[in-house]
Amino acid sequence: MMHQIYSCSDENIEVFTTVIPSKVSSPARRRAKSSQHLLTKNVVIESDLYTHQPLELLPHRGDRRDPGDRRRFGRLQTARPPTAHPAKASARPVGISEPKTSNLCGNRAYGKSLIPPVPRISVKTSASASLEATAMGTEKGAVLMRGSRHLKKMTEEYPALPQGAEASLPLTGSASCGVPGILRKMWTRHKKKSEYVGATNSAFEAD
């Protein structure tokens, strides 16, 4: 006699077949046989209750299942009308291609919206070139005004800086962000040195 034991895990269901001789002589073997039969029933019930996969996917993984299940599944597949598959296949590309084209159009429109309008107009007309030049001039003027403000702020914070160091200050960014650490160290050293030299000079001046 053949008994099948089903073991269920999170991934698949495995089937183990055990062959037991039909002639059972001792009552111990009968008890073992009945307990094994109950065990197989319990395992099958648990596998039906606690399976995590959908029932449609189980026949695809049935490499170790009975051939009867395979035959049944094959009959179900052949019983379906063959005209349903081409209709689905022909309907799917239309549904998929429409969002793709809309996405492409949306991306193109989004990309066009990101491009500034001034270079596009400057290619077509010469009047817009003057507009672009004035826009660039205003931007440069704004940057220069910001740079002069930062330079003024730096001169107020570091009054003992030499003229070359003031000229080499960055136009944008604050003193802590835009200035590198090496230049800050050099400026602080020069400041301390100038204060020290001034103190010694004032000591040797005549009263």
Curated annotation (Swiss-Prot):
Location in or out of the cell: Cell membrane; Nucleus
Residue runs in coiled coils: none
Pfam families reported in the protein's UniProt record: Vexin (PF15505)
UniProt keyword annotations, A-Z: Cell membrane, Membrane, Neurogenesis, Nucleus
GO CC annotations, alphabetized: nucleus; plasma membrane
GO BP terms, alphabetized: neurogenesis; neuron differentiation
Keyword Nucleus: yes
Subcellular location, principal: membrane
Residue segments, region Disordered: 56-100
Compositionally biased region (Basic and acidic residues): 58-71
InterPro entries: Vexin (IPR040470), Vexin_dom (IPR027900)
Function in brief: Required for neurogenesis in the neural plate and retina. Strongly cooperates with neural bHLH factors to promote neurogenesis.
Family that this chain belongs to: Belongs to the vexin family.
Name of this chain's protein: Vexin
Organism: Homo sapiens
Gene from which this protein is expressed: VXN
